[in-house]
């Protein structure tokens, strides 16, 4: 394929499809992480393109904390049913037994037990040797230096000083027993690329990405949308309706909304063209401490 004859988005698409096919051919038991967000939706769309008209040759995996937005769960179940994919859902049973939640135990412990440990449990349980993720290099500085094939040891830990070179489009997938890789087909995409591709391909997304009047309160410097009754209001807090949307999605107590009037995909793209802040500014887990994302990845986080 002559890359010079392709548009920017089609070049990114071709690269991602090549990576997905390469992993499917090279590894014995791959899986695709499905977190229900915009990047996961694009990655799933690319995977379906990669193997069309056949079905996906690997299952989807959702590591569920029990604290996602209700609209995310509804979207997940509908999407999986519509495309006929196999979905595996894993919740950390020890975390559930301990009643771990972001309000009582804080974002760091909640993320470590319900997401990081939950992910490692699921990968071990099913014996996956490769796991696709939707992370992009423009999101955060630790992800900017991570390879497309991110190697993990038998404890799922990432060592940024022990990464293999990736020359041109050649990827080294050799792993020893117990080791695995995390694969990031969207590494070279930007947030703007993602939205332009969603618009171009008419990819369905969770409605929370579009601006609408929603019940929110201000806490810890972010706008928290109240999604159910598991919250206790602090003195002086008031729930009010505001026109907001989300640039990134996660557990609802840990994900901040942004005030916006963008009710359509062109409106979101217009916002992205003038935005000077990271989409992860609304993720409470990234504020735990300096370099917290890299520390999480060293411990096994995606």
UniProtKB/Swiss-Prot annotation:
Pathway(s) annotated for this protein in UniProt: Sulfur metabolism; hydrogen sulfide biosynthesis; sulfite from sulfate: step 1/3
Domain of life: Bacteria
ATP-binding among keywords: yes
Record's catalysed reaction(s): sulfate + ATP + H(+) = adenosine 5'-phosphosulfate + diphosphate
EC number from the UniProt entry: 2.7.7.4
Keywords, comma-separated and alphabetical: ATP-binding, Nucleotide-binding, Nucleotidyltransferase, Transferase
Pfam families: PAPS_reduct (PF01507)
A biological process term (GO) from this entry: sulfate assimilation
A single GO molecular function term of this UniProt record: sulfate adenylyltransferase (ATP) activity
Stored InterPro entries: PAPS_reduct_dom, Rossmann-like_a/b/a_fold, SO4_adenylTrfase_ssu, Sulfate_adenylyltrnsfr_sub2
Gene3D superfamilies xrefs: HUPs
NCBIfam families from the UniProt entry: CysD (TIGR02039), PRK05253.1 (NF003587), PRK12563.1 (NF009214)
Quaternary structure, from the entry: Heterodimer composed of CysD, the smaller subunit, and CysN.
Annotated family: Belongs to the PAPS reductase family. CysD subfamily.
Cited function: With CysN forms the ATP sulfurylase (ATPS) that catalyzes the adenylation of sulfate producing adenosine 5'-phosphosulfate (APS) and diphosphate, the first enzymatic step in sulfur assimilation pathway. APS synthesis involves the formation of a high-energy phosphoric-sulfuric acid anhydride bond driven by GTP hydrolysis by CysN coupled to ATP hydrolysis by CysD.
Name assigned to this protein: Sulfate adenylyltransferase subunit 2
């Amino acid at each position: 394929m002559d890359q010079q004859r392709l548009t920017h988005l089609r070049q990114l698409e071709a690269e991602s499809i090549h990576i997905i096919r390469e992993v499917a051919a090279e590894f014995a038991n791959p899986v695709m992480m499905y977190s229900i967000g915009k990047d996961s939706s694009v990655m799933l769309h690319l995977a379906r393109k990669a193997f069309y008209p056949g079905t996906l040759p690997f299952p989807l995996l959702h590591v569920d904390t029990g604290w996602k937005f209700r609209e995310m769960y509804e979207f997940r179940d509908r999407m999986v049913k519509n495309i006929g994919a196999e979905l595996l859902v894993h919740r950390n049973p020890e975390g559930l037994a301990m009643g771990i939640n972001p309000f009582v135990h804080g974002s760091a412990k909640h993320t470590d037990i319900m997401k990081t440990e939950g992910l490692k449990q699921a990968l071990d349980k099913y014996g996956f040797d490769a796991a696709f993720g939707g992370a992009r290099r423009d999101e955060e500085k630790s992800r900017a230096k991570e390879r497309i094939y991110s190697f993990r040891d038998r404890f799922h830990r990432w060592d940024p000083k022990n990464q293999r070179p990736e020359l041109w489009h050649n990827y080294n997938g050799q792993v020893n027993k117990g080791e695995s890789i995390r694969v990031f087909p969207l590494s070279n995409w930007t947030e703007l690329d993602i939205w332009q591709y969603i618009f171009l391909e008419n990819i369905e997304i969770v409605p929370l990405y579009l601006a609408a009047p929603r019940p929110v309160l201000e806490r810890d410097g972010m706008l928290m949308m109240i999604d159910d009754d598991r919250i206790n209001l602090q003195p002086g807090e008031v729930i009010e309706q505001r026109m907001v949307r989300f640039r990134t999605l996660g557990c609802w107590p840990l994900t901040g909304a942004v005030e916006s009037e963008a009710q359509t995909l062109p409106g979101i793209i217009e916002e992205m063209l003038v935005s000077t802040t990271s989409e992860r500014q609304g993720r409470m887990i990234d504020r735990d401490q300096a370099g917290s994302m890299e520390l999480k990845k060293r411990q096994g986080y995606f």
